[in-house]
Amino acid sequence: MSEPELKVSVSQLAPSDREGWLTKQGGSIRTWRRRWFVLKGKKLFYFKSKGDIEATGLIELEQNSFVKEEKDKDKKKKYMFTVGTSKRVFYIFAETETDMKQWMESIKRNLDGEGGMKSGGNDIVSSPKINSEPTPKVNQNGSAPEKSSLSSPRSKISNAKSIIPFLREEESKVLEFWQIWSESIPPQSDLQSGTAIEFHVATSIDMQKLTWRTAGPQNIFIQKMVDFFWNVGAPESEIDRLNDVGAIINPVKIGSWIDMSDKGGMDGGWYFPVDIPLKLAIEASDAGEPTRKLSEWAESNEVVNCYSIGRDMGAAPPRQTETRFKLPGPDFIAQLNLAVDAFKTFEFPPIPSNALEILYQSSNTLEAGGLCLSVITSSEGFVRLGLLIPKPTRDVVGQLCEIGQANRERISKFETALGGCGPAFVEFQYLQKGFGYTVYKEGFDIVFHYMVGEDQSE
């Protein structure tokens, strides 16, 4: 298809043979998009809206093309049909059975005008599991309620939420945001044998900022994630970016995260918790001085791979991309010194001496090696840098609570709600000035990360 063929508006195609809203599967990660379709002769155009002056795409109907009704095995897209060409089979669904049949009849009629309909066709690939409508509005119904025990990770994160004062206010927009996100998590019943959904939560030491994360198999997560991003107003360009990065990395596991604060901060995004070359992660980030510095530092210190890449889906730029990787080095001290060097190289203030001293003094009791770095970049500069220390001892956690003036009682209640385990990681992080947007604490902070648990396939 030539680009000039797309340079046509909806109005220029009038009178059309048929037009209206349909939802089409597209992208390398098979998400569903609502599009305004216009059938004109043997060309089926689709637009992002009915007022667009240029088409998003075009399905060219050929002599051997076909159209037929499809049965979605999960019965969640009842009125689905396919349009097949020599290059691809397009999966499309309508809102009603009548609409579906009228579209199919119109396409058949236009096909019959030149050689007639083909009843057969190419082999049809199986439809993926799609779980909710991708319309940019809040899903009032949400996921079907799970019958979960008090020990399930879903129950634990819900219980932990109730410990947080700013998440107990009934009219809270932040609470509503949390609920929309939690309803976007696929049900346990969607899991296939040998797969799982993992749950994580992190809190700043003063418990005024929290991060919630969940991840699982790509095939059951992707559509619910996209629906969540639509529902909270993420721009379509960033949903396209998710598809583009997903096509490059093709992760088996994907997930979503949300940040929130007592000052009304609400942010969300996606992440791929998979091992990939760091160069690939940097290519997925917005180019700029930070990515250049990170690339040079990583190369000089033999940092080759990362274990997670994520990105925010906020309504306005600059976009932020987080990369996490393990620090090389023969032991804890060598890795800690390398982390200190990273703070200096990336022009962050040094980790406060009292916090750093706790690590040096406890190096024999902390896990040998295993230190990780979290780097968040944007086109406008480094955003945040974090040093992640795995399996901190109770003594280390206690000392950090002391210097961070933590509310020990509230943290204890929070941990009890999560099942009684201590942090899986403690993070020393620094948020650069200007990136707190008045709702997140800028400067140095201590964050506790918890692995809440997993939903296993039944």
UniProtKB/Swiss-Prot annotation:
Domain called PH: residue spans: 15-112
A GO term, aspect molecular function: phosphatidylinositol-3,4,5-trisphosphate binding
Domain of life per record: Eukaryota
Biological-process GO terms, alphabetical: endosome organization; receptor recycling; retrograde transport, endosome to Golgi
Low complexity bias (residue ranges): 143-154
Gene Ontology CC terms, in alphabetical order: cell leading edge; cytosol; early endosome; plasma membrane; recycling endosome; trans-Golgi network
InterPro entries noted in UniProt: Boi1/Boi2-like (IPR045188), PH-like_dom_sf (IPR011993), PH_domain (IPR001849)
Family annotation (Pfam families): PH
Record's compositionally biased regions (Polar residues): 124-142
Annotated segments matching region Disordered: 111-154
Protein's recorded name: PH domain-containing protein DDB_G0274775
Organism taxonomic ancestry: Eukaryota, Amoebozoa, Evosea, Eumycetozoa, Dictyostelia
